[in-house]
Amino acid sequence: MTSANPEFTVRRDVPQTMRDGTVLRADVYMPRGTGPFPALLERTPYSKDNSPECQVGSPPFFASHGYAVVIQDVRGRFTSEGRFIPFHDDGWGPNRDGYDTVEWIAQQPWSNGRIGTLGSSHNGIVILAAPRHPEVLRRIS
């Protein structure tokens, strides 16, 4: 499903398949224009469907300023498949969901390959696995 705003569009429940076949889902806020765009990633166990202003950075704000913003439900939470074990599949257990998601973003036609992350609390901890992908990850905040 896609919803529109004069400055950006939102693609809801976009699937990303992890290395073990588990499907995680994200909302992707896309700026107007042809791209490609730099991207910001936030992964959350608190539901990507919460008010966008509840996120660390406002996805509508960043999307209206030229960034693609990916807000993903972590494994086993809300719209994402799998079993939720805090931090287990984010890079410290057998799977590398943060890495796989950064890789997925980098391969999208709308991505220019420059990716930053956002997050505090649990959302901030799960992005710590992302530095394993230094060639595309530009900023962690």
Predicted segments with their positions:
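N-terminal cap/lid segment of alpha/beta-hydrolase-fold proteins
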Residues: 1-35
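Surface-exposed loop/turn and secondary-structure junction residues enriched for glycine/proline
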Residues: 11-13, 17, 21, 40, ...
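Conserved SAM-binding loop
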Residues: 16, 72, 119
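A conserved hydrophobic secondary-structure block that centers on an alpha-helix together
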Residues: 19, 23, 88-95, 109-117, ...
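Short beta-strand segments enriched for Tyr within beta-sheet-rich domains
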Residues: 24, 37, 136-138
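Cap/lid segment of the alpha/beta-hydrolase catalytic domain
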Residues: 32-107
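Primarily recognizes the serine-hydrolase "nucleophile elbow" in alpha/beta-hydrolase
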Residues: 42, 103-141
